[in-house]
């Protein structure tokens, strides 16, 4: 049986303790993009949302609360995978820097979703049930179980990398889309603005997974990757079209199903494989957040939440500009 070559990204190295010299400029640039997009939950104004909440239909409220319940739990699952496995496995300092910052951002997402639920739900029993949705809600539990099985499983790093790209790229897609639909209708400004920031972050995290995958020497077979992606698509479709139908917020389930397939095709393309569904984007207004890689959505700097000084420090090769104190003023 031929030996499988060791992956440079995973090969133990004392260099992992020092940030410089940068080994992978493209990873360093991703890290800097993540830094430039830092935001906090305190920067999201929820003052108008309570008034809007009272005008929503019971179906709309049900949809929003259960989407938020899934989001609140899923960020914790992503965190557990990053801290428990990926951070220990990846040995490249700049990749570990990205994961370290992603952990901080996922904590902010988790705080944001929890704040939204706190703000909207006044009944303490219902609030408790939603915060424990992984145990109390079958449709949330199914998605969570699929993600959790990859944390403790014996699958290769490549398989788990693809699976968590699906968690962040596909499992959030239908819900992100539905919340953007609310924005299109002029509803819930705090929720929809936080959704813009979070969907941008998750798009970058998904891009990072695709970048790391491209740097692996041993790739998965097309059949294996498409199997993982198709699994995720079916679970997301069931979640947002059946168990928690997007019709509750006035969206067409068939179009939503097509949108999920479209997002999955984009992910497959980013991973270097052929499309599975050949689906078109049925929601032209979602072009900006189709999680397509280095998106124009990211470059638009949603709400100007990109720290210009961080990005200007990059000069194309991962190095930083020289800082001088002897300039003439």
From Swiss-Prot:
Residues the entry annotates as binding Fe cation 1: 75, 106, 109
Stimuli inducing this protein: Maximum level of expression in mid-S phase.
Residues forming the catalytic site: 113
Record note on cofactor: Binds 2 iron ions per subunit.
EC id: 1.17.4.1
Main localization of the protein described in the UniProt heading: cytoplasm
Subunit structure: Heterodimer of a large and a small chain.
Similarity annotation: Belongs to the ribonucleoside diphosphate reductase small chain family.
Name under which the protein is recorded: Ribonucleoside-diphosphate reductase small chain
């Amino acid at each position: 049986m031929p030996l499988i070559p060791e992956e440079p990204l995973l090969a133990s190295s004392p260099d992992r303790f020092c940030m410089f010299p940068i080994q992978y400029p493209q990873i360093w640039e991703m890290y800097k993009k993540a830094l430039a997009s830092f935001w906090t939950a305190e920067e999201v104004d929820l003052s108008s949302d309570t008034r809007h909440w009272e005008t929503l239909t019971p179906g709309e409220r049900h949809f929003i609360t259960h989407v938020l319940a899934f989001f609140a739990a899923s960020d914790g699952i992503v965190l557990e995978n990053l801290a428990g496995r990926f951070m220990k496995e990846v040995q490249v300092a700049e990749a570990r820097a990205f994961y370290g910052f992603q952990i901080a951002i996922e904590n902010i997402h988790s705080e944001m979703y929890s704040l939204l639920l706190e703000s909207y739900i006044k009944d303490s029993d219902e609030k408790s049930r939603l915060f424990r949705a992984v145990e109390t809600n079958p449709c949330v539990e199914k998605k969570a179980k699929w993600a959790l099985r990859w944390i403790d499983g014996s699958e290769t790093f490549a398989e788990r990398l693809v699976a968590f790209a699906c968690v962040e790229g596909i499992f959030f897609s239908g819900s992100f889309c539905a919340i953007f639909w609310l924005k299109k209708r002029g509803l819930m400004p705090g929720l929809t603005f936080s959704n813009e920031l979070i969907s941008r972050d998750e798009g970058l995290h998904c891009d990072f997974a695709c970048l790391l995958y491209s740097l692996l020497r041993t790739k998965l077979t097309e059949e294996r990757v498409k199997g993982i992606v198709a699994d995720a698509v079916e679970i997301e479709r069931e979640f947002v079209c059946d168990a928690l139908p997007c019709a509750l917020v006035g969206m067409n389930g068939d179009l939503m199903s097509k949108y999920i397939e479209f997002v999955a095709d984009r992910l497959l393309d980013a991973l270097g494989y052929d499309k599975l569904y050949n689906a078109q984007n049925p929601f032209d207004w979602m072009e900006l957040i189709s999680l397509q890689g280095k998106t124009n959505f990211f470059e638009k700097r949603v709400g100007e939440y990109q720290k210009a000084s961080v990005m200007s420090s990059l000069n194309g090769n991962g190095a930083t500009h020289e800082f001088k104190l002897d300039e003439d003023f």
